[in-house]
Amino acid sequence: MIALDTNVLVRLVLHDDETQARAAERLLVRARREQTELFVADVVLCELVWVLTRRAGLSREDIAAALDQLLRTELFVVGDAAKIERALAAYRAGKGDFADYLIREQARAAGAREVATFDRSLKGETDFRVL
């Protein structure tokens, strides 16, 4: 297994640096050939969404589609796919950031009854308490 940093996924999605995008694609080809999984940590997904939103200006729909494609590709492995898929569904439907919904999923798994936040965009969202 090989763990990926955020910048590798950014290059694969955006192709904003052709040299690095080609190197990232070669890594995928090698991983497929060698039947090696590519691990994507939760924080990498959060950083990826941030970059795609803030730097690339992609829409929520486009970002959700990119994450969905990543989750459906057998080559990529994530920590807890069910939590990530629930967070992704909430991101598609809600107003918060993907990271907010992933935090909520991890908090629920840890037994927390709510997530305290100052983020006003989460007002009215289930299991968030805006302070």
Predicted regions and their residues:
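Acidic, PIN/NYN-like endoribonuclease modules and their adjacent C-terminal/linker elements
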Residues: 1, 104-131
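Short, well-structured N-terminal submotif of metal-dependent ribonuclease cores
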Residues: 1-40, 55-62
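Histidine- and aromatic-rich ligand-binding microenvironments
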Residues: 5, 40-41, 96-97, 119-120, ...
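A generic structural signal for short hydrophobic patches within well-formed alpha-helices
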Residues: 9, 45, 122-123
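Structured helix-beta-strand junction loops
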Residues: 34-35, 73, 94, 125
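Amphipathic alpha-helical segments within well-ordered protein domains
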Residues: 49-53, 88
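Glycine/small-residue-rich phosphate/adenosyl-binding loop
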Residues: 57-71, 75
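Active-site neighborhoods of divalent-metal-dependent phosphate/nucleic-acid chemistry enzymes
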Residues: 74-114
